[in-house]
């Protein structure tokens, strides 16, 4: 096959799609190049036969950043790439979410997508190129896929409006970082963080992106017209109409009744009993449907029952209407020895959230293609199996936990104080202790509460809510605060977080076509109503950050020294600063501009370290009055300590206007006395006076 190349202009960049030159044994392979900044090789392979033992669609997406792409060699002992980074995991999820709904219902053949960043200039994020490449590779692979999909990143500035596919530098000054993906007809996925933008501004960004990425879809269609392989001859299994009818006729009412049981565990127990009865009755003899087929049909009846009830205006599974938030129970300060804690319960979803403050040394070190950087804010989300009443694997964070943690982080990050105001490293951990829908948004609420309980000066409280959608024909219902079952059986998962003034994060995943601007607008308005309701209840418990940090949190003292003194504080080979830290039990961070942050487990430890630093760096100011302590008396005067490690001499002639025969007639060792600095010679010797203090005070010194 000869290489096929398509070029098109996409915002401020030229994008090139090339196939037929690299990875030709894959079902589909496309090399995406954006200007000369980014190149991503995307391959798609589909298994020709489905694995009969799998009852789900085995799609896997692997996004990987090779260090050679940025001209680097991996650090560490093993000089090769290791396990996926958090960025790679999040981007894999970002690519997966818009393509998964476009494979046909019932398609169970394994599909693997591999996106490899092979070149980057560190100007733009390669994720959009990877999403475009995935869509193009699927379009030419022959695998059944209802694409192509377009994708775009959007930034927003109050003065200039929306900006398509911004650079890293442009994102720094933006109030919005949004990624949108969809088909020519509809939006399928939104992932964003914002600085309190309005619902209209967020919706405008979604629609702007959808309009702009049509050029991507058209280019992929042109590529597929020249390079696509024949579409697989795959047909879905015919619907088991007779089996569905038999289950509905005999068990339909019982299934519908089971979905009025409000307690999840009781409802699941009843549905389990009914499923066993259905299998026992309909999968009994040879020639009848298998147990797997009966269970699948039972699940389809469940799906239709819940959806029909909702669109026809009947009460939801737990008896609520479409706009009501589940009952809230909010507590703060629940863990006595932590820096800040909150227990946030919404219905059968509960998060125990803990905030911990640390020093700059506790910041997360990130080794990315763009270079090393430190992240002073972490939010970790844990979802143990007991939260849903199950036994399960315990271990490191999975893709879902990383994704939910990042969404919660995006939601609260814009409301954190700057490093100049609050130079602590912050770690928030959300432990999901119960789950029945929207645990990530419970984490947002809990994180805001725990941070305020810890005394972190938040700009405003943040709350989050998960919305759902059920659409049958022209009928649709938008659901506030969805349950786990409503998420599973619905057509949309729409999470919105923000303050009373605006949106800080928006995540949307849509499983069907035909989500209109009207539906998104209604969902955003309904989410605002729910968010304000939750914020009102949160504010009754704690409406603003505590005035003081927890007594368990480290004490921080900030100071600045002359840059010439940095070497003195550090000492030869770091000996001086190491000795200060060991002896005072404090930690000291020094910046190149002379800024110093001292962290101590107690106020006393931090102050002791500060005094040690002052003793090394402080200089006596000529003409300034100090309260000093007489350290030593000699025949010709007295040595007075005015600063840590700084003694000056009060000559006997400078003790009093009257003649002084003996210094001890005026001063005693250990006595505190006010002195005026007269001079500091080029050897650092300080000349002091007692008799001139009164005159200096009178003149306003």
Swiss-Prot record:
It catalyses: RNA(n+1) + phosphate = RNA(n) + a ribonucleoside 5'-diphosphate. Involved in mRNA degradation. Catalyzes the phosphorolysis of single-stranded polyribonucleotides processively in the 3'- to 5'-direction. It comes from Pseudomonas syringae pv. tomato (strain ATCC BAA-871 / DC3000). Residues 554-613 form the KH domain. This is Polyribonucleotide nucleotidyltransferase. Mg(2+) binds at residues 487, 493. Pfam families: KH_1, PNPase, RNase_PH, RNase_PH_C, S1. One of its GO terms (molecular function) is 3'-5'-RNA exonuclease activity. Keywords: Cytoplasm, Magnesium, Metal-binding, Nucleotidyltransferase, RNA-binding, Transferase. Belongs to the polyribonucleotide nucleotidyltransferase family.
């Amino acid at each position: 096959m000869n290489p096929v190349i398509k070029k098109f202009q996409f915002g401020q960049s030229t994008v090139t799609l090339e196939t037929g030159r690299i990875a030709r044994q894959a079902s589909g392979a496309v090399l995406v190049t954006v200007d000369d900044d980014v190149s991503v090789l995307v391959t798609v392979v589909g298994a020709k036969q489905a694995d009969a033992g799998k009852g789900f669609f085995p799609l896997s997406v692997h996004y990987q950043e090779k260090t050679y792409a940025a001209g680097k060699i991996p650090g560490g002992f093993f000089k090769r790439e290791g396990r996926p980074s958090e960025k790679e995991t999040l981007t894999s999820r970002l690519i997966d979410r818009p393509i998964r709904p476009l494979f046909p219902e019932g398609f169970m053949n394994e599909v693997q997508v591999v996106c490899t960043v092979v070149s980057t200039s560190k100007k733009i994020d390669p994720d959009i190129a990877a999403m475009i490449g995935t869509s193009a590779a699927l379009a030419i692979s022959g695998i059944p896929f209802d694409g192509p999909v377009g994708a775009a990143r959007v930034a927003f500035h109050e003065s200039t409006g929306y900006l398509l596919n911004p650079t890293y530098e442009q994102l720094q000054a933006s109030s919005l970082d949004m990624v949108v993906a969809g088909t020519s007809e509809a939006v399928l996925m939104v992932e964003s963080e914002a600085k309190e933008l309005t619902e209209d501004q967020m919706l405008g960004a979604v629609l702007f992106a959808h309009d702009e990425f049509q050029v991507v879809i058209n280019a992929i269609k042109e590529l597929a017209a020249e390079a696509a392989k024949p579409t697989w001859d795959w047909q879905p299994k015919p619907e088991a109409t007779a089996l569905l009818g038999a289950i509905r006729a005999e068990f339909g009412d019982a299934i519908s009744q089971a979905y009025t049981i409000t307690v999840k565990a009781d409802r699941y127990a009843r549905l389990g009993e009914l499923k066993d009865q259905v299998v026992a009755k309909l999968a009994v003899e040879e020639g009848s449907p298998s147990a797997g087929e009966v269970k699948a049909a039972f699940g389809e009846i469940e799906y239709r029952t819940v959806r029909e009830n909702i669109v026809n205006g009947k009460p939801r599974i737990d008896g609520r209407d479409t706009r009501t938030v589940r009952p809230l129970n909010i507590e703060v300060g629940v863990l006595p020895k932590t820096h800040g804690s909150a227990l946030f319960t919404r219905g059968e979803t509960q998060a125990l959230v803990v905030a911990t403050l640390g020093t700059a040394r506790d910041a997360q070190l990130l080794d990315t293609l763009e270079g090393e950087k430190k992240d002073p804010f972490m939010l970790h989300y844990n979802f143990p199996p007991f939260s849903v009443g199950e036994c399960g694997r315990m271990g490191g964070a999975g893709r879902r936990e990383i994704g939910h943690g990042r969404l919660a982080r995006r939601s609260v990050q814009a409301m954190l104080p700057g490093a100049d105001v609050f130079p602590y490293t912050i770690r928030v951990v959300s432990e999901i202790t119960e789950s029945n829908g929207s645990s990530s948004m419970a984490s947002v609420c809990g994180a805001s509460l725990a941070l305020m309980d810890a005394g972190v000066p938040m700009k405003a409280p943040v709350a989050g809510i998960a919305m759902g959608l059920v659409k049958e024909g022209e009928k649709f219902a938008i659901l506030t605060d969805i349950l786990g079952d409503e998420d599973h059986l619905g057509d949309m998962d729409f999470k919105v977080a923000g303050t009373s003034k605006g949106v800080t994060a928006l995540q949307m995943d849509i499983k069907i076509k035909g989500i209109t601007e009207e539906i998104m607008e209604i969902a955003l308005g309904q989410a605002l109503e729910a968010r304000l309701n939750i914020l009102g209840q949160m504010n009754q418990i704690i409406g603003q950050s505590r005035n003081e940090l927890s007594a368990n949190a480290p004490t921080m003292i900030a100071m600045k020294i002359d840059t010439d003194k940095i070497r003195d504080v550090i000492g030869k080979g770091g000996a001086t600063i190491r000795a200060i830290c060991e002896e005072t039990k404090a930690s000291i961070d020094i910046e190149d501009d002379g800024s110093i942050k001292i962290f101590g487990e107690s106020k006393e430890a931090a102050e002791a370290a500060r005094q040690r630093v002052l003793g090394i760096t402080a200089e006596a100011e000529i003409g300034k009055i100090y309260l000093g302590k007489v350290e030593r008396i000699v025949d010709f005067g007295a040595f007075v300590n005015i600063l840590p490690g700084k003694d000056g001499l009060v000559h006997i002639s400078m003790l009093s206007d009257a003649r002084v025969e003996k210094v001890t007639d005026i001063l005693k060792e250990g006595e505190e006395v006010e002195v005026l600095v007269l001079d500091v010679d080029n050897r650092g010797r300080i000349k002091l006076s007692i008799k001139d203090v009164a005159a200096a005070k009178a003149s306003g010194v």
